[in-house]
């Protein structure tokens, strides 16, 4: 029995990937389906050096664990870097230097990978096409579902040229019959029981029982029961050590039964693994682990813990110590090792693992003094916030603040309250954020001045800036800067300057804001404060975008995205803003593409809101369906916060969508939903656009003369000057919209030409209606069915979608379009994502709804009717006077 029936095609694909070189191949499949056996068979056939490592099934995995295994085999710079505590990027670079055409790197079970190891995989995926070798990573696809961290990594690397994915299928009925025949077993019954899972099949057949066990656990334990008692006791120990048990560890814990090791290996239960042994299948280990009585399990974990505390070479692995300490019920050891493991994981960039270790310590920390437990909560709160667990972080800092108050530590209480405020904002707990921020200031102002007071001022400034209370934001930020400079607190100085600059910038004081933000950037860069370099660039990009300084906005957004990619930070908010900038600059296809990519990856509300607004604007302006669907989602996300910087964008986009759909009443209601707030905050651009849509829909009351110049000129009835102002800011759609209000037919024809170039169907239809009313022949527009970019799709994606709707297979589509099957696979995945559907059938229905399957000869080129945005010839529109 080879155990590798029906695997030759997969082995061939792996061999092809090795021949091509520069590949990271993810091999997925359910637990026990045969991923590891496939990779071992491939490696056994290859004439290559094999560097293998595995992720551990610990409650909290060791940071960079699989790469430590690889370093033990490779030695050299990689081992030196890991011993020195290098970060994920450095580890990835060192590993890539080992990957040549004579080397295969294998990383097993990456669904258990710690965060730092996932970061290494990200870098490998982006850069592996620059080397000659092959990296293979196995994972359980049935465990990496939903919001699993590995799923995010796979999504991010989906378009990387050097990354491929293979799926190991279950064995067919015929294959199971072939495997069962030598054992005289009922192959049909085995297949019914196992559904073709290779491990289940192998274990059941290996049991060689007269009747089939009811479960795989029974099969595994039946095999174990036939071993000598000493061998069973040895398996009890090995089953409690995830991944691999070193021989020295077994000598220390189970030396009296170590002689039975060969028996366990010979019976196919264990396999050798370097200087240790491991179960041949993880499911077998789990089955054996579950059979160890609870009292014996605790005693064995305690013995393993004692041995691991004094390894024969090097220092102890605190992650493993924390795991076995908890399993042994040794709270003292947990409190010693779990915080140390958390700090080590955090330093390696594995913040999720750090948070888990702090949670582990907190589970055992009820008996600690108030200050001791508060310190653990501090650590957990920070790691939770860094990993997007805002509510958990807020709860931790709330408890920490109470404990510091109980212990009389006012400075620490104030610091915790400040962090609590920051955590409550993304958690949507705005009232708590306000109370915590004010509480931090009250506590710290009652004490001697301290750096923590400056941080509290900076947090209050940040909150005021977010709500566009710009004068208050400036005042609080100036106080933060003054305290930071007094104490030489460079981090708070950069933080305060960041908020100070942003407050000036979004108040319309653009040059002042830029200068302050660049100073914040310089302070961070010159002092190695990497945490604050990114925010300076991000605020420059998004703030300038909000002020329609689009060229400079794009420059800083690109710089921030490049910075995040270089340092493996989170780029999605800047990518969402860049998508919106593309839309305003008339690059609708690029904007929609990028916004959809953001939605595929981002979970934070602010990134999603911005991307949804970009998509909603494009859909409304093109006349595509679904504009309000995405804008409804954006509004739902933004409403709890109540911040103008979100609501202003959303209601302006919704007012425009309503106007282009011919609904004047809804245009007014959407505009007025945020107009009073925009006036209260004196926001030049939100107030200007909302006033414009109110006026277009007939609400002709006073508007403030301080609104942004392009909108002021439109409201005053100066279409040419308004168009020039929009053109100067790089906004072709807005310029054409403004020019269409001219009484000069040549101007209106020019506006129509630009709107048609952009694919702005509804606005172009309104302009053609007006031209007819003026007695001017309106040129026929492009046919909707031939217009590219419907629903945010590229021209090629539209071609593929039409063929999908016809029921064509990907291979047939590839042959017809003369592209690779893989290219068509990528197109289909992109189409499903952009259309928000989950199947080819749903995509076909969406294609019909978008008009992609209609005969273009029967379509009305004028598109839907919308109210005219311009006065009739010889008339001057009634314009409200400035207040």
Predicted regions and their residues:
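Extended alpha-helical scaffolding segments used for macromolecular assembly and cargo binding
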Residues: 22-24, 38-42, 68-69, 102, ...
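Short secondary-structure boundary elements
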Residues: 31-33, 171-368, 379, 677-681, ...
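Tandem amphipathic alpha-helical repeat scaffolds
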Residues: 32, 139, 287, 323, ...
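Conserved phosphate-binding/catalytic loops and adjacent sensor/switch elements of nucleotide-binding enzymes
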Residues: 33, 37-103, 112, 132, ...
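Sensor-1/coupling segment of RecA-like P-loop NTPase cores
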Residues: 120-166
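Amphipathic alpha-helical segments of tetratricopeptide repeats
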Residues: 266, 342-343, 362-363, 401-408, ...
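Helix-turn-helix DNA-binding segment
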Residues: 769-772, 780-858, 871-883
């Amino acid at each position: 029995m080879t155990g590798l029936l029906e695997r030759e095609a997969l082995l061939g694909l792996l061999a092809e990937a090795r021949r091509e070189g520069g590949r990271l191949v993810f091999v997925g499949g359910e637990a026990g389906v045969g991923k590891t056996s496939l990779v071992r068979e491939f490696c056994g056939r290859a004439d290559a050096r094999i560097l293998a490592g595995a992720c551990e099934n610990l409650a909290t995995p060791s940071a960079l664990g699989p790469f430590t295994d690889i370093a033990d085999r490779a030695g050299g710079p990689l081992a030196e870097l890991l011993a020195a505590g290098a970060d994920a990027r450095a580890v990835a670079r060192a590993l890539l230097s080992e990957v040549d055409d004579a080397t295969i790197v294998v990383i097993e079970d990456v669904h258990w990978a710690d965060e730092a190891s996932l970061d290494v995989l990200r870098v490998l995926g982006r850069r592996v096409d620059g080397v000659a070798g092959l990296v293979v990573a196995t994972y359980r696809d049935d465990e990496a579902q939903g919001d699993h961290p590995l799923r995010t990594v796979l999504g991010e690397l989906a378009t990387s040229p050097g990354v491929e994915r293979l799926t190991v299928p279950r064995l067919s009925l015929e294959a199971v019959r072939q495997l069962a025949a030598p054992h005289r077993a009922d192959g049909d019954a085995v297949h019914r029981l196992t559904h073709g899972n290779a491990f289940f099949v192998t274990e059941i057949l290996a049991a060689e029982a007269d009747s089939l066990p009811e479960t795989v656990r029974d099969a595994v334990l039946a095999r174990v029961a036939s071993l000598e008692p000493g061998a069973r006791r040895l398996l009890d120990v090995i089953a409690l050590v995830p991944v691999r048990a070193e021989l020295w560890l077994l000598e220390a814990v189970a030396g009296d039964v170590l002689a039975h090791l060969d028996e366990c290996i010979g019976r196919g239960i264990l396999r050798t693994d370097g200087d240790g042994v491991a179960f041949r299948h993880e499911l077998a280990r789990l089955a054996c682990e579950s059979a160890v009585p609870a009292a014996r399990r605790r005693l064995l974990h305690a013995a393993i813990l004692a041995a691991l505390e004094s390894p024969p070479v090097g220092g102890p692995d605190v992650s493993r110590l924390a795991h076995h300490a908890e399993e042994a019920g040794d709270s003292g050891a947990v409190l010693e090792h779990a915080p140390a493991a958390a700090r080590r994981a955090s330093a390696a960039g594995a913040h999720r693992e750090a948070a888990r270790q702090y949670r582990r310590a907190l589970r055992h920390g009820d008996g600690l003094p108030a200050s001791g437990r508060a310190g653990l909560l501090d650590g957990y709160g920070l790691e939770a916030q860094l990993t997007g667990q805002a509510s958990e972080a807020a709860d931790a800092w709330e408890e920490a603040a109470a404990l510091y108050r109980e212990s009389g530590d006012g400075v620490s209480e104030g610091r915790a309250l400040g962090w609590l405020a920051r955590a409550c904002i993304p958690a949507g707990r705005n009232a708590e954020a306000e109370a915590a921020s004010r509480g931090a200031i009250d506590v710290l102002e009652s004490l001697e001045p301290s750096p923590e007071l400056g941080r509290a001022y900076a947090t209050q400034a940040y909150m005021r800036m977010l709500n566009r209370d710009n004068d208050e934001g400036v005042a609080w930020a100036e106080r933060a800067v003054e305290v930071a400079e007094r104490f030489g607190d460079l981090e708070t100085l950069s933080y305060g300057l960041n908020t100070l600059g942003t407050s000036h910038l979004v108040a319309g004081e653009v040059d002042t804001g830029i200068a302050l933000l660049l100073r914040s950037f310089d302070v961070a860069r010159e002092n190695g404060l990497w945490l604050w370099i990114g925010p300076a660039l991000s605020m420059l990009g998004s703030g300038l975008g909000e002020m329609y300084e689009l060229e400079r906005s794009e420059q800083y957004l690109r710089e921030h995205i490049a910075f995040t990619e270089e340092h493996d930070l989170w780029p999605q908010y800047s990518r969402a803003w860049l998508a919106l900038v593309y839309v305003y600059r008339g690059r609708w296809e690029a904007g929609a593409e990028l916004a959809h990519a953001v939605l595929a990856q981002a979970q934070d509300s602010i990134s999603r809101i911005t991307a949804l607004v970009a998509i909603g604007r494009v859909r409304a302006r093109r006349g595509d369906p679904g504009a309000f669907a995405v804008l409804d989602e954006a509004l739902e996300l933004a409403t709890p916060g109540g911040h103008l910087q979100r609501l202003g964008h959303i209601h302006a986009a919704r007012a425009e969508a309503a106007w282009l759909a011919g609904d004047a009443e809804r245009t007014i209601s959407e505009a007025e939903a945020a107009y009073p707030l925009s006036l209260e905050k004196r926001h030049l651009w939100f107030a200007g656009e909302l006033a414009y849509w109110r006026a277009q829909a007939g609400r002709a009351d006073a508007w403030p003369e301080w609104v942004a110049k392009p909108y002021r000129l439109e409201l005053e009835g100066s279409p040419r000057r308004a168009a020039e102002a929009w053109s100067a800011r790089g906004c072709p759609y807005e310029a054409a919209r403004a020019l269409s209000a001219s009484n000069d037919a040549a101007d209106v024809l020019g506006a129509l030409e630009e709107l048609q170039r952009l694919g702005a169907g509804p606005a172009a239809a309104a302009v053609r209606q007006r031209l007819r009313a003026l007695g001017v022949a309106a040129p026929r527009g492009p046919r909707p069915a031939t217009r590219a970019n419907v629903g945010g799709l590229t021209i090629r994606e539209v071609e593929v979608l039409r063929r999908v709707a016809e029921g064509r297979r990907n291979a047939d589509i590839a042959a017809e379009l003369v592209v690779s099957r893989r290219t068509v696979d990528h197109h289909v995945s992109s189409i499903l994502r952009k259309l928000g559907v989950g199947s080819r059938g749903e995509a076909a229905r969406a294609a019909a709804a978008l008009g992609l399957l209609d005969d273009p000869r029967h379509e009305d080129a004028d598109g839907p009717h919308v109210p005219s945005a311009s006065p009739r010839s010889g008339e001057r529109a009634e314009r409200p006077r400035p207040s």
